[in-house]
């Protein structure tokens, strides 16, 4: 069912609107039942805040807590925060279960990540996904000023561009996908494949991390809806593809996302961070080498791969448990989804096995924390670590790899990086590895641990040039310039 258009949709005053599943704040329930809002920092917020303030901008999203229809404390009114208007979209417990945990994270997420876990296709989840996307589109239509620019974010909202186009044809609409876009043969499994492609084609510009995702989308537009598309290769921030859809031309491009690298670089150089890094090394027993993994607890991240590789290197005597430790920081994630619960149990069994085999009383060889880590501690861990392990089976970009590089102004450290991350296309001087080949992962870890100091500095210097030059601000500018049909940022 299509959203209804009408003059009442044209009532907003925001010239620039960001639409995302989550608001850049978290709603917290107090003990007395009232609510407060806490800022939720992130790279996207950092990049877009100045623009939102300058252009009377609004951010539309869910505050993060399920709210049922009879909830007297429900967030329904716009919130003014730091010069931005935040517009909450209310989701009930059923919405969260079926739209978010269901269709978004048990259907789309595994399908888009190479079917590492089998996607589940429930019609009820799809119906809820359509309904929630419609609510986001309607909230946007009521918020955006005449002729405004709207930037829709990520896989949870792939139907919003078309719905919004029907409500507000005056708007300029961009869409960016923050996760990988799958190969054609995998996407074709989706029962609602045509609806998804048509939903995205409501945008004026559809953006992906890498040219490969853009090429896949162009093929699907031809195959599923018979659209005429450009045939040449899509470039990075240049050479856009095109889809002729009705009377409109939709641009398709690749825009690799990044981080606020200058801020991280500055943070890592501070006296407090350097002191905390020394304390971390001391708390770990001052080992000769520290390996580090930092991930959301997700089956795509390859945490089990690196634990197995580490265990086998210890078994084979290629790593000495007396002077090397692995620290795995795992942020809790999607704890009500069955596949995530099973994965956590498996990883924690592996941790117990490694420490049981190779640790000593008071000296575990593998330190595992399953909780959120404060930002200042995380930066100190990056500064302290000799080898960063980033081994996803599939990842749209992986910003942790870039964060580690941004924190290494000393040109120390080494990065072991999966070939199946978007970051691998940019950080070519990392120790690249195929996470499906355990011997290759072991060899990469060993090479990183034993690299000559000058070789390590050469690699880190080259990666830092890339990360510091291509920051999150440049990513946002390149996308929005392309959306406004200005000359794209090259390189």
UniProtKB/Swiss-Prot annotation:
- State the organism's lineage: Bacteria, Bacillati, Actinomycetota, Actinomycetes, Mycobacteriales
Amino acids binding UDP-alpha-D-glucose: 42-43, 296, 301, 399-403
Q: Which reaction does it catalyse?
A: ADP-alpha-D-glucose + D-glucose 6-phosphate = alpha,alpha-trehalose 6-phosphate + ADP + H(+); CDP-alpha-D-glucose + D-glucose 6-phosphate = alpha,alpha-trehalose 6-phosphate + CDP + H(+); GDP-alpha-D-glucose + D-glucose 6-phosphate = alpha,alpha-trehalose 6-phosphate + GDP + H(+); TDP-alpha-D-glucose + D-glucose 6-phosphate = 5-methyl-UDP + alpha,alpha-trehalose 6-phosphate + H(+)
Q: What does this protein do?
A: Probably involved in the osmoprotection via the biosynthesis of trehalose and in the production of glycogen and alpha-glucan via the TreS-Pep2 branch involved in the biosynthesis of maltose-1-phosphate (M1P). Catalyzes the transfer of glucose from UDP-glucose (UDP-Glc) to D-glucose 6-phosphate (Glc-6-P) to form trehalose-6-phosphate. Probably also able to use ADP-Glc, CDP-Glc, GDP-Glc and TDP-Glc as glucosyl donors.
**UniProt cross-references to PANTHER family, sorted A to Z:** BCDNA.GH08860, TREHALOSE-6-PHOSPHATE SYNTHASE
Recorded hits in Gene3D superfamilies, A to Z, give: Glycogen Phosphorylase B
Name the CDD domains for this protein: GT20_TPS
Subunit arrangement? Homotetramer.
Q: What is this protein called?
A: Trehalose-6-phosphate synthase
**Can you name the source organism?**
Mycolicibacterium vanbaalenii (strain DSM 7251 / JCM 13017 / BCRC 16820 / KCTC 9966 / NRRL B-24157 / PYR-1) (Mycobacterium vanbaalenii)
InterPro entries given for it? Glyco_trans_20
Q: In which pathway does it act?
A: Glycan biosynthesis; trehalose biosynthesis
Enzyme superclass (EC): transferase
Cite the GO molecular-function annotations of the record: alpha,alpha-trehalose-phosphate synthase (GDP-forming) activity; alpha,alpha-trehalose-phosphate synthase (UDP-forming) activity; trehalose-phosphatase activity
For the ligand (D-glucose 6-phosphate), the binding residues are 22, 100, 154, 334
Q: Which UniProt keywords apply?
A: Glycosyltransferase, Transferase
Note whether Transferase occurs among the keywords: yes
List this protein's GO terms for biological process: trehalose biosynthetic process
Supply the EC number(s).
2.4.1.15, 2.4.1.347
Q: What gene, per UniProt, encodes this protein? A: otsA
Similarity comment text for this entry: Belongs to the glycosyltransferase 20 family.
Highest rank taxon of the organism:
Bacteria
This entry carries the following GO cellular component terms, namely: cytosol
Which Pfam family is an annotated match for this chain, by its short name?
Answer: Glyco_transf_20
């Amino acid at each position: 069912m299509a959203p209804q258009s009408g003059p009442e949709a044209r009532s907003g005053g925001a010239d620039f609107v960001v639409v995302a599943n989550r608001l850049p704040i978290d709603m917290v329930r107090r003990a007395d039942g009232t609510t407060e809002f806490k800022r939720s920092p992130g790279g996207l917020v950092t990049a877009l805040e100045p623009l939102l303030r300058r252009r009377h901008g609004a951010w539309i999203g869910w505050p993060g807590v399920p709210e049922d229809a009879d909830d007297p404390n429900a967030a329904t009114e716009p919130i003014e925060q730091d010069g931005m208007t935040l517009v909450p979209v209310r989701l009930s417990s059923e919405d969260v279960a079926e739209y978010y945990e269901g269709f978004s994270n048990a259907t789309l997420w595994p399908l888009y990540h190479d079917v590492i876990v089998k996607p589940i296709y429930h019609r009820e989840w799809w119906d809820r996904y359509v309904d929630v996307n419609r609510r986001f589109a309607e909230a946007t239509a009521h918020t955006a000023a005449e002729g405004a620019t709207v930037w829709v974010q990520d896989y949870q909202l792939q139907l919003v561009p078309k719905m919004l186009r029907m409500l507000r044809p005056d708007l300029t609409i961009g869409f960016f996908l923050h996760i990988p876009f799958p190969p054609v043969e995998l996407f074709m499994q989706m029962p609602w494949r045509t609806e998804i492609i048509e939903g995205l084609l409501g945008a004026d510009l559809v953006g992906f991390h890498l040219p490969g995702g853009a090429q896949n989308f162009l093929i699907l537009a031809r195959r599923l809806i018979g659209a005429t598309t450009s045939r040449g290769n899509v470039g990075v921030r240049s050479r856009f593809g095109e889809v002729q859809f009705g009377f409109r031309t939709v641009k398709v491009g690749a825009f690799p996302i990044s981080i606020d690298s200058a801020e991280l670089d500055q943070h890592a150089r501070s006296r407090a961070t350097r002191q905390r890094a020394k304390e971390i090394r001391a708390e770990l027993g001052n080992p000769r080498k520290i390996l580090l993994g930092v991930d959301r607890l997700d089956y795509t991240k390859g945490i089990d791969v690196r634990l197995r590789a580490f265990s086998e290197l210890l078994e084979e005597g290629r790593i000495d448990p007396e002077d090397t430790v692995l620290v795995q920081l795992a942020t809790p994630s999607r704890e009500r989804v069955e596949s995530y619960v099973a994965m956590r149990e498996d990883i924690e069994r592996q941790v117990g096995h490694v420490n049981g085999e190779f640790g000593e009383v008071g000296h575990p060889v593998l330190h595992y924390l399953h909780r959120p880590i404060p930002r200042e501690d995380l930066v100190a861990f990056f500064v302290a670590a000799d080898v960063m392990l980033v081994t996803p089976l599939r990842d749209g970009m992986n910003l942790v790899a870039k964060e580690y590089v941004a924190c290494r102004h000393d040109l120390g450290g080494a990065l072991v990086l999966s070939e199946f991350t978007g970051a691998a296309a940019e950080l070519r001087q990392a120790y690249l590895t195929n996470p499906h080949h355990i011997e290759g992962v072991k060899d990469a870890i060993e090479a990183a641990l034993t690299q000559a100091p000058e070789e390590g500095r050469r690699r880190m210097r080259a990666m830092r040039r890339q990360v510091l030059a291509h920051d999150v601000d440049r990513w946002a500018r390149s996308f929005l310039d392309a959306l406004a049909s200005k000359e794209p940022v090259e390189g």
